[in-house]
């Protein structure tokens, strides 16, 4: 199988928001103070980490992408420590230093991996003049692939509408992790990433997925957004866009130790992938995988490219996702031994559209597990022409792996998957389109093994060619 590419060295992201320093004191707690009914912590270790918008920048730098940080800090020790942390990670620090305010600092005291107390040192920036921040943004935004506005409600983004307009004029996507219930202030942004509590506080209670979709699409329309990503804790995340099917991703977290900074990780991975030119679905797939990693760490943490790559490549250890042929054989054998019916289909799946989603959902209903075999890039070129594929193999596989209806995704380099089908021998072989069963590649092998072969129609009015024509017409 071709390796999934996670090189982001061409991506450039600008982060503007509430910059913080996170301090951690770790110690042992074995007794109660004689002075008051509180635990006594014997401090054994201390750490300092970039927090808030600075943590977003750290996550981006961990992916080897170019990142610049804009914000407000104080002329103090915490500001100096933060500057050193940023320089050590090759982050361009364009924060404005103020004599009138301290650097926002949060001190957490922990024992046995439990947070006992948090002390906040801060003053609101709401009364600080925004023009220097706006001038720096206007001057430096050209050439960046995405702008993140990291809002913790501390006042750095008091002029958020002007910031959005500067980015829009420069044709730079604006991604915002929102704060509070006044989402109107984010009007015109490209994408918002509220968590479920924040989302429901704005749109009202959602009883099911349909409520999330309908209310989310209305919010997109009302605020003139391009997309909305609702992070749903143990239920994963849902991407919504006008004229696109909802894209639901189940959580990939195995163990949750600390959710501190998880939202920072999601938006940083999302923006980096978008700045790298990757489709929204792939960007969400990567962000979801990264969130599953970071909640397994203690405190404000980042996810690096190696960890993310391992999570993508080794998701197959759980029995699902992008797999090698050897592992697929193992998983299908185990599934058959459990009495599960294996369904297999194949295609280029160049630009995923509602017709594809509906087709794959219907294919999955024919059995218990669905395999999607995907043509490699060279195979697509031979079949579709030199201008195809639009999306790379890694992007196409990542998007398919994120669909709830798909269990396993595998690439093949030949023009047809006949050899792969003969190795896997699914119980049901499915192909989309106006085929007769005897015309479907692999039918003889499947029939000889006692399996079934079916053709399913695509949804009317949905085709990759039509999507490409619409995109070309916009240009």
Swiss-Prot record:
One of its GO terms (biological process) is ADP-L-glycero-beta-D-manno-heptose biosynthetic process. Disulfide bonds: none annotated. ATP binds at residues 195-198. Keywords: ATP-binding, Carbohydrate metabolism, Kinase, Multifunctional enzyme, Nucleotide-binding, Nucleotidyltransferase, Transferase. Homodimer. PANTHER family: BIFUNCTIONAL PROTEIN HLDE. Catalyzes the ADP transfer from ATP to D-glycero-beta-D-manno-heptose 1-phosphate, yielding ADP-D-glycero-beta-D-manno-heptose. This is Bifunctional protein HldE. It comes from Haemophilus ducreyi (strain 35000HP / ATCC 700724).
